[in-house]
């Protein structure tokens, strides 16, 4: 089977290996912590859900190899990385990529640096599209914020970073969280897993679904919904649903038409699961 590819790009100590470990569940990855540079690492893994099976190559790269690099130096190195990435030499890599995760260290990366870096990420996003249709790329891009172990980042700073990322039409994921937020949306580590599992992959093998089990699950969900509708003591959480829809609509304003269609389908699936 032809493998799929995603790229995790970031500076040293920004959570790249943690993300790769989360996706692959590979116990060997932590042994790479002592490697001097993570540039060029490839983690080969596979993914199986109840619907499909696929092979996945997780490409890890660093645009700066020094933890002590200044913001100016990191930006210069990131821009240099982008110039190489968009060159003809890397055309084959761009063609096979299904996703990009850009990692930042929310404790050490300044707001100014993050803002400038996001502008370069936007250029990387454009380079992944077709020359005639700049946004005709079926992959995903997420900005993942991490924090060193046993350290805390202020909530106000996290919100400021999230707003900056969303204003660029990109998704922000805080690696320090997990579970669901108040709107029943997956967040943090669980959102990364959901993003990977729900993506429309280029190469995969569909698995046969047990039709009887599917019907059983469907009937059980319908019965649960019916009970919520007829039982006054059961709340349907309509306020949560409307809040989710309003948030989704606001987020969709910053997306292209093609991205809106995919995002709308994803939100609909989440609401159905929520019900």
UniProtKB/Swiss-Prot annotation:
Family annotation (Gene3D superfamilies): 3.40.50.11960
Keyword annotations: Chromosomal rearrangement
Annotated InterPro entries: Irc6
A GO biological-process term: vesicle-mediated transport
Keyword Ligase in annotation: no
Keyword Magnesium: no
Gene Ontology terms for molecular function: protein-macromolecule adaptor activity
Protein origin, superkingdom: Eukaryota
Function: Involved in gross chromosomal rearrangements (GCRs) and telomere healing.
Family under the similarity heading: Belongs to the IRC6 family.
Designated name of the protein: Increased recombination centers protein 6
Species classification: Eukaryota, Fungi, Dikarya, Ascomycota, Saccharomycotina
Gene: IRC6
């Amino acid at each position: 089977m032809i493998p799929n590819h995603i790229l995790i790009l970031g500076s040293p100590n920004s959570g790249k290996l943690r993300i790769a470990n989360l996706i692959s569940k590979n116990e060997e990855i932590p042994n790479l912590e002592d490697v001097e540079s993570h540039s060029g690492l490839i983690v080969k893994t596979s993914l199986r859900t109840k619907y499909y099976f696929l092979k996945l190559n997780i490409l890890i790269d660093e645009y700066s190899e020094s933890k002590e690099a200044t913001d100016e130096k990191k930006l210069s190195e990131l821009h240099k990385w982008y110039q190489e990435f968009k060159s003809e030499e890397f055309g084959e890599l761009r063609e096979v990529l299904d996703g990009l995760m850009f990692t930042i260290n929310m404790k050490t990366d300044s707001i100014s640096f993050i803002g400038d870096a996001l502008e370069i990420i936007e250029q990387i996003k454009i380079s992944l599209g077709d020359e005639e249709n700049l946004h005709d790329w079926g992959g995903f891009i997420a900005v993942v914020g991490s924090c060193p172990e046993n350290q805390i980042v202020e909530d106000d700073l996290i919100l400021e970073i999230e707003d900056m990322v969303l204003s660029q039409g990109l998704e922000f994921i805080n690696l320090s969280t997990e579970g669901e937020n108040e709107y029943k949306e997956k967040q943090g580590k669980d959102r990364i897993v959901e993003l990977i599992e729900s993506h429309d992959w280029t190469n995969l093998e569909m698995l046969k679904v047990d039709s009887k089990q599917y019907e059983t699950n469907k009937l059980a969900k319908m019965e649960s919904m019916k009970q919520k509708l007829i039982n006054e003591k059961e709340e349907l959480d309509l306020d949560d649903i409307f809040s989710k829809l309003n948030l989704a609509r606001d987020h969709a304003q910053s997306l292209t038409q093609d991205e809106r269609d995919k995002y709308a389908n994803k939100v609909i699936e989440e609401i159905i699961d929520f019900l």
